[in-house]
Amino acid sequence: MVEELSGGNPRCRRLRRLARDRGFRHGEAAYIVEGPTLVAEALDADRDVRQVVLPTSAAGHDLVRLVQRAGVDAFLVPDRVFDGLASTRSSQPALAEVAFHDAEAAALASTSGPLVVLAELGDPGNAGPLVRSAEAFGATGVLMVGGVDPYNPKLVRAAAGSSFRMPIATIDDPVAAVRLLTDTGVSCWAAVPHGGIPPTEVPSDGPVALILGNEPHGLDAGVVEACTGLITVPTVGGVDSLNVAVAGSVALHALAAGSG
């Protein structure tokens, strides 16, 4: 039996706040996952899914049985109430509360595979695809420095399940992040629009990290100076720069090929 909730139920109020309030998310160490596919992936990745809410029109959805088999509490709410729970208006008929699963920055620094450092990225629509690319191209972790919340609902959607599997750590200072990595033998390569070597020319004789800056301003000078070297994704024609998600993904692919 799946319990039905009213719009004023405390569970509904909690989910609304988790969807919209970064401070509340971090105070509760929990976030929301939207859509049946992502909820199923969170369960498959053995994340701590605390509850799942669906609109009454989705009462017969296969996800209900999957959630019940996993021993997770499932609830139904009227469709109009469900529409007000999600972070955006969506046709995705499922919403889950999931516990935080932070990685440790020091643990990431000791891994052998490529790492990605996102320094003060502000757009979850860029950070999410980079988490996805990190998994796709064999990175062993993502280190997020300031900027967007790694548990922002838009980032989670844009990562398309990769944020459940890719270790993600946070640290406050980008220079400190680079020094943490270099002190453990990781060579750090700052992505810049011009003046760097192609990512295919990065030496593959040890662990590497790709350092990506925020969308309008790139990396601060102090971060660039702390890095081992600079890389630039070469372009032709009238294109003189790339979106950070595109440039980062291209560079990651090249670094993965070089380390293979």
Regions found by a protein language model. Give the residues of each.
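Short, aromatic/basic amphipathic alpha-helical patches
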Residues: 60-71, 222-223
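RNA substrate-binding interface of SAM-dependent RNA methyltransferases
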Residues: 44, 101-103, 107-195
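Glycine/small-residue-rich loop that forms an oxyanion/phosphate-binding "nest" at active or ligand-binding sites
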Residues: 67-97
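Structured adenosyl-cofactor binding patch, chiefly the S-adenosyl-L-methionine
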Residues: 96, 133-137, 147-150, 155-163, ...
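Active-site/ligand-binding-proximal alpha/beta "capping" segment
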Residues: 189-239
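Boundary-proximal intrinsically disordered activation/regulatory segments immediately upstream
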Residues: 1-65, 147-149
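Short acidic-hydrophobic, aromatic-tinged amphipathic segments that line or gate anion-handling sites
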Residues: 3-7, 73-78, 167-176
